[in-house]
Amino acid sequence: MEIVPVGEESLGVRSMCLYVETRDLRILLDAGVSLAPRRFGLPPHPLELQRAREVREQILRLAAYADVVTISHYHRDHFTVPYPSQYMATDSETYKAVYGEKTVLAKSPHDLNWSQRRRHYGLAKALDGVATVVYADGGEWRFGTTVVRASGPLWHGPAGSKTGRVIAFAVSDGEETLAFIPDVEGPVEEEAVHFAEEVKPTVVVVGGPPTYLGWDLASAVSNLKRIVDLRPRLLVLAHHLLRDVQWREKVGEVLQYAERRGVEVATYAKLAGREEQLLEARRRELYGETGRGEEAGEEEE
């Protein structure tokens, strides 16, 4: 199994896009990229805009090879929108290049919050006749010796979160099993851990806690330790966690726990052999400003 990191906060953008290739299948997980419209009261820096364009180019290049594309949920950093956007590096035709003639394994709209349901409607209308959309919640598919499995609905953060629900995916080729668990924000709820326990992963990619919002990390740390106890060879911490320049200190207990148990912890940047580029987290520095405080609350992405 080949795992290629495409876009994520350690690579300078909001995303969790991964490309995975097995003997039988080429799958592009969550082919989206976006930038925070405001952070520290500032718009995206030109370096962030450049990185968004670069990541979008890589998404398009890999989409040309992919058989399957996933949509874990309808936040704009996890799918390609069907309209032009500078912050998502799209024009009016980009979505066709990503999804056209593909099988799209997508989150069902039946239990979405209002904003995700609205985005789903716009995308579903655009993809009619363009792609084969399969609502994936709880499903399983076999491609030769490769099995793709989707979780049931998981909370995007704490139970009852206003940001809605997501689904996770597992890809297994008989030798490796990748668990791709986006935007569970920790995981803060045990349901995401249960999915990992069920699929017995050798590699786990998980959306970590949004430490920059000042949340209580006790549940996230506990659940990350439970994932470590599954003894994957690799744990990739990603996304919301990497919006904090002090993320290593915030989850230091997990890093030490993983080291004692022989589980390697990495970021997308490390997997890509690149230096971390926490551009959003360093936006004030990029603009040469230090006086602006952190925003409160969680935005809808």
Curated annotation (Swiss-Prot):
- Which Pfam families does the record associate with it? Lactamase_B_2
Q: Which InterPro entries match?
A: Metallo-B-lactamas, RibonucZ/Hydroxyglut_hydro, UPF0173_UPF0282_UlaG_hydrolase, UPF0282_hydrls
Matching Gene3D superfamilies: Ribonuclease Z/Hydroxyacylglutathione hydrolase-like
Q: Which family does it belong to?
A: Belongs to the UPF0282 family.
What is this protein called in UniProt?
UPF0282 protein Pcal_1546
Organism of provenance: Pyrobaculum calidifontis (strain DSM 21063 / JCM 11548 / VA1)
